[in-house]
């Protein structure tokens, strides 16, 4: 199971006990925010893309979307998300549990500047019902090969019904 792989990965940093396992799904930003009793923007969503030759993950705030212009300027390719059947093979995690922890060596990891607005965020931990509360500094420590980028834009708030 991917969560066990993440638990082992986080054990090297003394953080395996900080994984939050939920009784309900946290597979989407909204579900995760509800389950964790936090705002959607504090969910660190992990988006998986295909580069020129290798897959990569961009971790961004839950209220953000990829800005196609910034993305192309940064990565020199159009934003092309991995297909459903490619996600687990390229990230070691199924859709709903994709995270920056315990991913294959060939998969690059980027942290988007949108995360820096918060004192802490909640990335998934390999399953559709797990997360961990971390600061951006802690995320940098837990994912030492990650690089910071600025490729997202904040979504416009939706009007209330």
Residue ranges and their predicted role:
Residues 1-161:
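Extended, low-hydrophobicity, polar/charged segments
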């Amino acid at each position: 199971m991917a969560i066990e792989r993440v638990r082992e990965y986080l054990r090297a940093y003394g953080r395996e006990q900080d994984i939050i396992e939920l009784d309900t799904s946290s597979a989407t930003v909204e579900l995760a925010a509800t389950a964790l009793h936090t705002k959607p923007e504090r969910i660190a969503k992990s988006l998986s893309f295909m580069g020129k030759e290798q897959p990569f993950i961009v971790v961004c705030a839950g209220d953000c979307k990829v800005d196609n212009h910034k993305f192309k300027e940064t990565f020199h390719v159009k934003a092309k998300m991995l297909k459903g059947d490619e996600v687990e093979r390229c990230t070691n995690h199924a859709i709903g549990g994709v995270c920056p922890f315990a991913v294959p060596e060939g998969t690059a990891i980027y942290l988007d500047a949108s995360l820096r607005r918060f004192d802490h965020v909640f990335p998934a931990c390999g399953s559709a019902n797990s997360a961990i509360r971390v600061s951006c500094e802690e995320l940098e420590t837990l994912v030492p090969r990650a690089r910071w980028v600025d490729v997202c834009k904040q979504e416009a708030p939706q009007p209330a019904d």
